[in-house]
């Protein structure tokens, strides 16, 4: 089996276990046996909006208009091939982790991540669904928007992102989810106001 790891950083020889600054996961090396899935990690982002169909097919569903293009067009990075090993399988399809360092056996420079995704789609390895598809089913769209509202609001609240509105993470939510950002921060600011009795 081939194991992949993607990074915006070139020249790596060994992957050291690290703790994600964005996700609550243990210190580990994350790998995938699916090249198309690895491409998502060419950039560092606050969310990765991919999933799997019941049939096990990888897909990306734009959570906001032109999300894939906006996040990945013109972005480059390295796709690493890692040594074979007895890696632990996670609950996420095609994902494996290692608590130990992992040696790199090969590397491929990806000039444009968005173009690489289009090639993977043409090869039948991923389904890329644009925002219009996401919004075409009113019932599913409402459920997904409600889920995004809840998840992003909790993230803004728990990590206190709203207290640093000029941070990169705050800008990401302000730009891509303006309604959720406004509604959440308005609620939080109201809660912070002193009550006069």
Residue ranges of predicted features:
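ADP-ribose/NAD+-binding catalytic cleft of ART/PARP-like enzymes
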Residues: 1-26, 41-44
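Short, surface-exposed beta-edge/turn micro-motifs
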Residues: 1-2, 25-29, 35, 75-78
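Short, flexible beta-strand-to-coil junctions
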Residues: 5-11, 33, 82-87
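A general structural signal for short secondary-structure junctions and capping/turn motifs
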Residues: 21-22, 29, 68-72
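Short, well-structured hydrophobic secondary-structure segments
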Residues: 29-50
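Conserved NAD+-utilizing ADP-ribose enzyme module
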Residues: 44-197
């Amino acid at each position: 089996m081939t194991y992949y790891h993607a990074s915006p950083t070139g020249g790596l020889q060994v992957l050291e276990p690290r703790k994600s600054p964005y996700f609550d996961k243990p210190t580990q090396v994350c790998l995938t046996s699916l090249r198309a899935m690895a491409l998502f990690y060419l950039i560092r982002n606050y969310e990765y909006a991919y999933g799997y169909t019941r049939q096990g097919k990888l897909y990306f569903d734009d959570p906001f208009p032109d999300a894939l293009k906006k996040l990945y067009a013109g972005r480059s990075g390295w796709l690493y091939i890692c040594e074979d090993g007895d890696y632990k399988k996670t609950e996420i399809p095609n994902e494996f982790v290692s608590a130990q360092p992992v040696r790199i056996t090969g590397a491929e420079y990806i000039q444009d991540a968005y173009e690489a995704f289009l090639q993977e789609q043409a090869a039948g390895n991923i389904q890329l669904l644009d925002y219009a598809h996401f919004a075409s089913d009113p019932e599913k769209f409402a459920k997904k928007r409600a889920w995004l509202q809840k998840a992003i609001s909790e993230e803004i609240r728990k990590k206190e992102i709203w207290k640093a509105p000029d941070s990169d993470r705050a800008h990401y939510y302000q730009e891509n989810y303006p309604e959720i950002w406004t509604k959440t921060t308005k609620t939080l600011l109201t809660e912070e106001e002193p009550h006069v009795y």
